[in-house]
């Protein structure tokens, strides 16, 4: 990410193989560099971005000559400048923004991401497609033939162009790292994974990471712990995901699908995760064929309503989408309290005994 950016959408892979403008023209792009890299801001969608705060946002932060094409005022022409402006405003107001101010801030951050390509940080003459560029107004207002070109370039960059490049890079570095220790190595192979990754991990005997709510098969809504490969670590979540109890309350529709289809329970899913449900999910993991089942402490505590923390949101460790998030989670029990809770410890031992 450039130092002027706050959101990850403005970043790019490193190391990577970016494109020159000549490369892009040769691939069918029919526009200039500014159309690709400058925030695309037009009056016809500003209302969608700012809602009732549109007039205030335009007046304070944007310039225009014709009330159709807009660009940022110099003092707000990066996400970091926007961030600093609202940080100063928060300080004046006792540490908080009003709902309208937060809405404007989010809209401005979004508009800074209204680009199709981002400049390479080492060589600004080279360009990287913005991740998910097809979700931008800039893309939607292209002619159909240019949309096809952009999608072809986007998919080439993110799914094909780097495969051999990254494989070669991995094979130069990873064998030294894995060979330097007798410990088992686990790779965080979640999300958008290049096609070369599974083969490299298999060749170097690096364990995969399997999470039930983050399936690697795009055709299923949830993975099942029973389907995890032996060479893997199976878990309910990581420090970068919400703990089970918080996840249960995030999306009602997803929770209902999990309750009926993954758990096989009838009726309407409860609004909060009971200890019984938490134990059911953990029990599924205990029977996984994965070499390792390693669960977050918060999810173990969830099986006992007398032990777990009252507020599920207070159990969250990290929020990757928020670069300013402060890691402050600590177990609410002392180690001595945990060790002396014979009933809870017996409960955990009974569950883990099913692994053997």
List PLM regions with ranges.
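Catalytic cores of glycan-processing enzymes that make or break glycosidic bonds
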Residues: 1-356
């Amino acid at each position: 990410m450039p130092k002027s950016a706050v959101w990850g959408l403005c970043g790019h892979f490193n190391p990577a193989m970016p494109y020159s403008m000549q490369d892009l023209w040769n691939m069918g792009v029919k526009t200039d560099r500014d159309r690709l890299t400058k925030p695309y801001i037009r009056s016809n969608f500003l209302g969608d971005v700012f809602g009732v705060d549109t007039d205030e946002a335009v007046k304070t932060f944007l310039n225009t000559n014709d009330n159709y094409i807009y660009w940022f005022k110099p003092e707000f022409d990066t996400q970091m400048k926007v961030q600093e402006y609202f940080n100063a405003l928060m300080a004046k107001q006792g540490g908080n923004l009003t709902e309208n101010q937060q809405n404007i801030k989010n809209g401005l951050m979004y508009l800074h991401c209204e680009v199709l390509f981002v400049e390479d940080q080492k060589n600004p003459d080279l360009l990287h497609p913005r991740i998910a560029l097809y979700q931008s107004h800039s893309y939607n207002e292209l002619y159909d033939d240019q949309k096809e070109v952009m999608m072809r370039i986007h998919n080439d960059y993110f799914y094909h162009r780097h495969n051999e490049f990254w494989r070669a890079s991995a094979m130069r570095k990873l064998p030294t790292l894995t060979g330097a220790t007798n410990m088992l190595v686990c790779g965080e192979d979640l999300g958008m994974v290049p096609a070369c990754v599974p083969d490299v991990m298999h060749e170097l005997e690096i364990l995969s990471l399997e999470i039930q709510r983050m399936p690697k098969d795009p055709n299923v809504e949830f993975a099942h712990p029973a389907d995890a490969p032996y060479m893997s670590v199976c878990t309910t979540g990581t420090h970068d995901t919400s703990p089970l109890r918080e996840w249960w309350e995030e999306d009602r529709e997803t929770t209902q699908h999990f309750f009926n289809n993954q758990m096989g329970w009838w009726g309407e899913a409860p609004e909060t995760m009971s200890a019984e449900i938490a134990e059911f999910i953990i029990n599924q993991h205990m029977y996984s064929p994965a070499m390792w089942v390693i669960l977050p402490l918060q999810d173990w505590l969830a099986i006992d309503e007398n032990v777990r923390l009252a507020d599920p949101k207070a159990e969250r460790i990290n929020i990757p989408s928020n670069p300013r998030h402060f890691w402050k989670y600590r177990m609410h029990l002392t180690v001595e309290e945990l060790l002396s809770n014979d009933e809870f410890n017996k409960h955990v031992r009974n569950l883990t005994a099913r692994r053997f």
